[in-house]
Amino acid sequence: MKDPSRSSTSPSIINEDVIINGHSHEDDNPFAEYMWMENEEEFNRQIEEELWEEEFIERCFQEMLEEEEEHEWFIPARDLPQTMDQIQDQFNDLVISDGSSLEDLVVKSNLNPNAKEFVPGVKY
């Protein structure tokens, strides 16, 4: 449907609507459409910095994973063969309590000393 105000066959030109070379007459700066480029270097620097940061974080995670795998695969206590001296030291570290602490344990015990010995699978 046509607009009745524009019923004439020739287009009406109003001074405010005239645009020359993509700019209206009111536009004082002929380079306004290129103003987005003003901060292009700062934008590029910021993006580059973010990319470097992401790469650094990725490398850190990769190194952490590699270290974790190295430690996971090699556990000295498990993977190295023990020498006789180490085994002897472990046996010497085992403490067999002396009789005095055993007597204290018996005095404080609630067990019946006259009870039958427990044998698995035998019903009394």
From Swiss-Prot:
Belongs to the PAIP2 family. It comes from the Eukaryota. It is found in: Cytoplasm. Keywords: Cytoplasm, Translation regulation, Ubl conjugation. GO terms for molecular function: mRNA binding; mRNA regulatory element binding translation repressor activity; translation repressor activity. It holds the Pfam family PAM2. Interacts with the second and third RRM domains and C-terminus regions of PABPC1 in a 2:1 stoichiometry. One of its GO terms (cellular component) is cytoplasm. Only the PABPC1-interacting motif-1 (PAM1) interferes with the binding of PABPC1 to poly(A) RNA and translation initiation. This is Polyadenylate-binding protein-interacting protein 2. Residues 22-75 are annotated as: PABPC1-interacting motif-1 (PAM1). Acts as a repressor in the regulation of translation initiation of poly(A)-containing mRNAs. Its inhibitory activity on translation is mediated via its action on PABPC1. Displaces the interaction of PABPC1 with poly(A) RNA and competes with PAIP1 for binding to PABPC1. Its association with PABPC1 results in disruption of the cytoplasmic poly(A) RNP structure organization. It comes from Bos taurus (Bovine). Residues 105-120 are annotated as: PABPC1-interacting motif-2 (PAM2). One of its GO terms (biological process) is spermatogenesis. Ubiquitinated, leading to its degradation by the proteasome.
